[in-house]
Every structure is written in structure tokens, then in C-alpha cells.
Amino acid sequence: MTFLSYTDTRNRLREVLDTADGGVPIGIERHGHRVVLLDLARLHELLADSPRLRRPEAIADGDGWSVFLPDTPIAADGADLDEATEEFVVALREYAQDWVERLRFAPNHAQHWPLVHFVSLSSHADLAAWVRGGR
């Protein structure tokens, strides 16, 4: 894989973006730190299929439904499955925001980066489908 300097990246930005858009990973290196540009759809697919990304679980619970993500503090309730799903998507977004702001530094939350990236790259409809067992 090619790693370009920050200056080279800036000077060749159109080419760099076209390369990533074409599905070819391209890297940028600055002060010894490396990052990679990837096509969003491919990264989203990779994260969705990752064994590190647990699947939400839904259970009927007396007066309604509960949706939760095992090994995380993310959960939601609703009168029916649709309402619980909608509340869960909101909870996912809130967790992702909290993770970016502060939880990523906590040892018991740091490992949830695949989830946070998946949530950040997903639309509301993507997340609702994922909660319901889709991709």
C-alpha cells in the first residue's frame, strides 16, 4: 500500500480521493502516524461483518419489548418492537457521541471502536435494519 506524506496528499488530493473511491486503500503518513482512506461502503460492509461487532438482541418483556447490545451499556424499551428499535437507534447514536467525547479513553469502553465507527457510518435506516437482523 502506498503511504503519502501530508504535503503529497494535499498536492494530489484529487488523485488520492479517486484512488480511495475506486476501492484501493491509500495511506497518509504524518509525523510517524499512519491513517488509511477507504471507500465508505466497503468499510461499512467490513464493520457490519466483523465478529467484533455484536448483534443486538430483542426480547418481549411483559408490557413491551427491550432491545440491548450484549457487553455494552446500550439498551432501550418500547411498547412494541418498532418503538424499542427506534429508541435503540437513538441510544446507539448517543453512545457513539459519548464514546467520541470521552468514553474512548476508558479501558472498559475502548474496545467498542468498531461499533462506534459502524454507527457513525450508518444512516438511521441502516441501523434500524441492523437491529432487526438485517445488514
Question: Where are the predicted features?
Answer:
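Extended, non-globular alpha-helical segments
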Residues: 1, 46, 56-60
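Generic structural signal for individual residues within well-ordered alpha-helical segments
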Residues: 10, 82-85
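Short, charged, surface-exposed hinge/linker loops at domain edges
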Residues: 15-55, 86-135
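Short aromatic-glycine-(Arg/Gly/Cys) micro-motifs in beta-strand/loop hairpins
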Residues: 52-71
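A short, exposed loop/beta-hairpin motif centered on an aromatic-Gly-Thr core
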Residues: 70-82
